[in-house]
Amino acid sequence: MDKNTLVGFVLIGAVLIGFSIYNRPSQEEMERAQRYQDSIQTIALQEAAKQAEAAAQSTQALTLDSTSLFFGANQGTEQFTTLENNLVKVTFSNKGGRVVSATLKDYNNQQGEPLTLFNEEESALNFAFEGKNENILTEDLFFQPMNVTDSTITMRLQTIGAGYIDFAYRLLPESYLVNFDIRAVGMQNFFPAAQKTVNIDWSQLARQQEKGFDFEQRYTSLTYKPADDGSDYLSEMKDDKESFEEPMQWIAFKNQFFSSVLIANQNFDDVTLESKLQKEGSGYMKDYNAEMTTFFDPTGKEATQLQMYLGPNHFKTLLATNDLVINQDEDPELEDLVYLGWPIVRQINRWFTINLFDWLSGWGLNMGIVLLLMTIIVKIIVYPATRKSY
């Protein structure tokens, strides 16, 4: 190493040492920085302690507050009860007092098993009752099954006193319709005098039932029926969310060939609907959610009357179900869940295509095969006219 190089290294080293000494913080600055760091850690610890305390208090309020009117319903063991007729098997859980699955006996899935619309993990139904001093959220409370028969069950949410709320279900014979009444008994002092509604939060993942994802996606939609208008639906091809001022007669979580429909005798108000697309391969088409209110009488003199249709989008079946809907002030028009096209085409579809569909599906064929055969038959019928046009 020559002399110039050595001198260069020495100078560089001297500059670095001098720069580090010059920029070194003073003792006072280091103490101030340490105090700042300590204060940051103290604040973080205090905040964490507050959050832990709040969580503990929340849990304690849920599980240990013996002053709650529903203290005894906070804990329990989940049990299931099944109602069935010749068409559908509906399973209920005492947790939340709700329907947790529906299986259609006359339809099979891709594995050849009875087709299930949804199960407990794929659906939720929560009722929120606003009280004077506490609110009731039914989804996490345990009900007591009462009056169980082959076609009826009453889920009772018992207070620590004599009052209770009943969810009374009745599966109608030879039908996909479940009548659902809600009634409060002996709870006038729990609710505010002005309380006239109950909040409902309903959600469901729409299963992929057919092999063709894109085609099924296109005909899977969250459909709704305003009380004074025809039915409509959210977008089938993108995420969509809408809020409505007008009352709704029913809301349907519709798949291509099957639907879960919630119908209100006293209509739904303050409705917000949301539909989210699901990815191919997930096993689901869409994630549905509906938030709304409906009539509720805290005195128990009048029941909240709901109905659930859990079945196929079969035109004649839906048409017959219209007559079983309690609210007949307006035509329920459940058959609109089957899209028949524009007015002229609609008549052809109603009187020819639907009968052809019923005949083919009566052979127990997969829906995809039924549609393929229908396409071939229709093309054969229109072939002579099509050939002449060329």
What are these regions (language model features)?
Residues 2-3, 113, 150-153, 165-170, ...:
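Selective transmembrane helix interface/packing segments
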Residues 163, 299, 377-390:
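Membrane-interface amphipathic helices and adjacent TM-edge segments
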Residues 1-50:
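Subset of Sec-pathway N-terminal targeting signals
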Residues 311-367:
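Interfacial loop/helix-cap signal at membrane boundaries in integral membrane proteins
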Residues 13, 375-378:
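Hydrophobic core segments of alpha-helical transmembrane domains in multi-pass membrane transport
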Residues 45-64:
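Intrinsically disordered, low-complexity linker and terminal tail regions
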Residues 73-333:
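Soluble non-transmembrane domains of integral membrane proteins
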